[in-house]
Structures are given as C-alpha cells and as structure tokens.
Amino acid sequence: MVMLGAVCGFTACDLEITPDTAIAGKDAAHLKYVSALRNGIYNNMTTVTAYSNLVNTEYYTDLFNETINSGNRGGFFSRWNLHADDQEILAIWTNYYTTILQVNYALEKAALAIEQEPENAEELKLYMGEMYFVRAYMIHQLALRFCEDYDPDRADAQLGVPCPVEYAPGAQLPRGTLAQTYARITEDIKSAEGLVTTQGSQNSKYITVDAITAFKAQVALQMHDYDNAIAYASSLYSKYPLVNTREGLENLWLQGTCTETIMQLEVTRNTYNLIGATTDYLSGSYQSASGTYLYNPGYVPEQWVCDLFTADDYRYGPYVGPATIRNIDSEGRLMMKLAGLVGLRSTETLLNYYNMPVVFRVAEMYLIEAEAQYRKNGSGATPLSTLRTARGLKGTSATGEALFTEIQNECVREFIGEGHRLFDIKRWGIGMKRNAQTACISILAGGTATYEMQKSADDPQFVWPIPHYELQNNPNFGEQNEGYRN
C-alpha cells in the first residue's frame, strides 16, 4: 500500500516530535513518547469509527433515500456512481491505512522502549496489545468495504487487501488473498489477547478484554466459524445487560451512557473536532413557538424501514420516529438516534449531531448468536427473542426462512445509522431493493432510478473500488475489483 504522505496526527503533548514523526533525541525509547503515540492512535480510531465516516455505507444500501436537501453529500454513494478516482474512496482507504501505519510505527518504538526501560515493560506491553487490536480492526474494516464477503471455500482465491506489519510508508505490497487478510486479522487478535489485561467495564473508552471478545465474535461470524461466534458473543451477556426501557435507549444516544456498551470512544467538548456531524439525517431547527423541531433532512429512511418500527417498540422515537419535515404535507419519519449528545450542545435546543462512537455493544452479540445458530442448525429464536422482548416486542417462534428474515429485520431496527447494513447484505447474499418513504417522495432526489433502485445479490459493485492512486503507484498491488475494471 502506498501512502499519500508521511504519517501525521500523533498527539505530541510536550514531546519533541518532528513533523514527520521522527524521534527527537532525548525522547526516543521512552514510555512517555509511546504514550503520546498511543493517544494519537486512539484519536485516529475515534475519527474512523465516527458515525459521520460511516454514513456512506448506509447511503449505499436500501436504508435511506437521498433528498433534494443533501447538497450531493454522499450522492455518489446513494446513486451507486463510484469510480476508482473518487476522492471520497481514496480518503476512506487512506484513513484506515494511515492508522495502520501509525500502529506499526508505535509498535516499533514500544518494543525499543521495553529494551531501554524494562521497569515500564508491563504498561508498554499493554499499549502494544491495544495497537495489535487496532491494526486488526482497521484491516477488517478495509476487507468489509473493498473485498467480497468471506467464503471459506473460496477465500484462497478471493482478493484481499495489503496488510502492512512494518513501518514503511513507501511499501508497495500486494493485495494478496482474502484468506491471507483474515489470517493477519486473527493473528493480530491473538497478539492483542496475549497483551491486553484491562478488564471490561460498561462504557469503557479503552480497548479491554471484553472488547477483544466482541471483535472476535464479529470476525468469527464473518469467517463462518459459528461455534466460536456463539461462544464469544454469549460470554458477554451477564456483564452488559440489555436495556429494557425507552428511556434507557434515549440515554444511550443522548447521554452517551448505557449498560449495553462494551466499548465507546470518548469525545468531549475539547475533542469533538475528531468526529464529523451527522447533520444530514435530521438538520433540525428548533421552533420556539411550538417547542418542536422542523427538519430539513438530506436522507430519509425508506418506507419498509419505517414500517419495521411499531409503537410498542422502545426504539420507535429514539431510533426512528415521527417528524415534521419542511416542504412535505404530512408527517414523515426520520432516523433520530444520531441527533447528538446533550452534553456537547452549546444550547439545550441546538442539535449538534455529535455522538461518541459506540464500537461494540451487547445487542450486536445477541444478533451474532442468533445468526450463527441459524447458520449452524436452523435455530436462533432464543437470543433473538431475548433482544426483542428487551425492546418491548414479543418474542418469536418463527422457524426456517421466516426466522432468518426476523433476524435480518432486527439487525435493521437495532443498527440503522451505525454502518452495518452494507456488510450484512453482503454476508447474507440478499441483494437490495429500495422503497421510497411515501410521505417524502416529493423531496427525494435522483428520480426513480435512485429511490427505486434494485441490485441483485451478485452485483460486483457491492464491493467498492480500489483507489486509482493505489493502483497507479503500486505495481505489485494486483487487480482492481471486478465491478470497476473497465
């Protein structure tokens, strides 16, 4: 992989670090230097996991329709008009690889610091474990976007992504196979497991033993390792109880605290510049006369999504709910969960659209177990029903394909806006068909070709293009993805 420039963005504090992040004399091989590098890596992880950086995976699917208010933000994704030379695609690719490069740099310096400061070895090893985790996580995110869904029977032939393990900004690495990519992910997870000793706690802002377990559950499901996916996911239930009230779900998104949260990266008034705002889901202005909001959204949920949220569901309101929308005659439905943390608002009624990235929460673990059980032996109703009843719905007795449909629908209800849908579609092999929200048709953009778009499960453009910059500057890379070779 070829980087656009030198690694930047480390949190230097008071250390003497040059602009290209070279060690400056007395600060070499010290815990305080590695600690500063660690801060920078956490900052980068906060940025790449921010919901503002996940919107394009949502716009690409059948969850949202673009409106005339979008200003074309995300429009190329919504219209499936991606090309290898798109700057947004290059930015996504570069953000992940920049973080990986920072990790590799920090790992080298941490190893050197252990030699020079053996009295700090325990803390430095913990930092190294966190860095291995971050590298595995970044590679996995790249694979989810730029590779096919993992198929154990074909992984040795499926195209992967470069997996740099040394600090070499100019390295020209081949993309390799998807089997090799996941081998690197699992190897880094093992390295993290051996070094991270921080025990899990609700709303942890750091990488913990439990965060690693949650990540293992995600990867195991992706690799069709269903027994381990079930074991990893279910091991987290007791420490992170499901929320079973509407107020509890509101607290998750408005207050940033929840018993379900396994890992949530911290954002404060001083650091919210690390993340972007998810304004286009709402763009609301407070109407003092009525005490309500008038919304001008760039993207609205599709009708089939709105229909999944019934009044008895505690997520109706906090996740998707009724809204007064500018220039439509009847009440519409909007995705409400990312209106922003109250504690980051400048005034009580001014929506800011800044939310702390919730990297792992236990609701996903129930859905992982349900899907893994279904894939393994056709079961899965028990964990699915546990989640449904916690959300105010009735449990399910569905079986067969009807059960799998219920699992899929629950994934939409629970994780709308959080960047899961594209990867779910690929893993399930179901294709997509858009279905415009009836109340909002008059403000939709792109015509029926966009808001009634249909894609078959085998459409190669479910995989995003490799940036042209990478292909042009890395002769060892290999092939462009199938959907973008002409």
Can you say where each PLM-predicted feature lies in the sequence?
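Sec-dependent bacterial lipoprotein signal peptides
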Residues: 1-12
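Extended ligand-binding clefts on enzyme/binding-domain cores
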Residues: 223-224, 230-234, 238-350, 355, ...
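Membrane-proximal, proline-rich intrinsically disordered regions
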Residues: 13-61, 305-312, 435-486
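Inward-facing hydrophobic residues that define packing positions of alpha-helical scaffold repeats
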Residues: 100-103, 182, 189, 233, ...
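Alpha-helical positions within canonical tetratricopeptide repeat
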Residues: 184, 228, 379-382
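Conserved, well-structured interaction surfaces
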Residues: 73-146, 176, 194-197, 350-357, ...
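Short, surface-exposed recognition loops and adjoining beta-strand edges that mediate ligand/DNA contacts
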Residues: 23-28, 52-70, 147-157, 198-278, ...
